[in-house]
Amino acid sequence: MRQSSQVRETKETKIKLNLQLDESTNVSIQTGVGFFDHMLTLFARHGRFGLQVEAEGDVFVDAHHTVEDVGIVLGNCLKEALQNKEGINRYGSAYVPMDESLGFVAIDISGRSYCVFQGELTNPKLGDFDTELTEEFFRAVAHAANITLHARVLYGSNTHHKIEALFKAFGRALREAVEKNANITGVNSTKGML
């Protein structure tokens, strides 16, 4: 089974994260940031991933370090779980509607870290979650996993719905990208490596 477990401890956070790419029954998220827990649960559910996250952070300051560091560890686990990347689709994309909002995510498991984020999040805070941290999370994942990730809110009016559409689209796009494909021999690149 393609999986990874990692711990990252700094003076600001302690993150324990387990990711299973081929098993979706075990999802448990506890970051201390309720809205972020909800988004990670949606990501795992719609991507059909097993995901367990325990995070302790300096949320008395704000949620920035916790959200960013969870993104870093998730990216590291994704990179490790993919092993040599042989036989995977490599590319994945998904549009997801959430009521009046529409989100889009495209992924290339390229070995090159790059993130493009486009979306106007008009409500600056949802619970304890600063909505600008949505972009920080996606940037952290893309950088740590060495993937190219485009996340875009096409339209919408409700900030919660916009972010929810992105996390669901992220799960669905990543599922497509990591899926094994019997028609692909080796890695899906003319270079012979990713």
UniProtKB/Swiss-Prot annotation:
Which reaction is the catalytic activity of this chain?
A: D-erythro-1-(imidazol-4-yl)glycerol 3-phosphate = 3-(imidazol-4-yl)-2-oxopropyl phosphate + H2O
Sorted alphabetically, the keyword list is: Amino-acid biosynthesis, Cytoplasm, Histidine biosynthesis, Lyase
**Record pathway:** Amino-acid biosynthesis; L-histidine biosynthesis; L-histidine from 5-phospho-alpha-D-ribose 1-diphosphate: step 6/9
Q: Name one GO cellular component term.
A: cytoplasm
Q: Does the keyword Secreted apply?
A: no
Biological process terms from the Gene Ontology for this record are: L-histidine biosynthetic process
Q: List the Gene Ontology MF annotations in alphabetical order.
A: imidazoleglycerol-phosphate dehydratase activity
This protein's record includes keyword Amino-acid biosynthesis: yes
Q: What is its EC number?
A: 4.2.1.19
Q: What class of enzyme is it?
A: lyase
Q: Which Pfam family is one of those matched by this entry?
A: IGPD
Quote the subcellular location field of this record. Answer: Cytoplasm
> Which NCBIfam families does UniProt cross-reference here?
PRK00951.1-2, PRK00951.2-1, PRK00951.2-4
The similarity comment for this entry is:
Belongs to the imidazoleglycerol-phosphate dehydratase family.
Name of protein? Imidazoleglycerol-phosphate dehydratase
Origin organism is: Bacillus cereus (strain B4264)
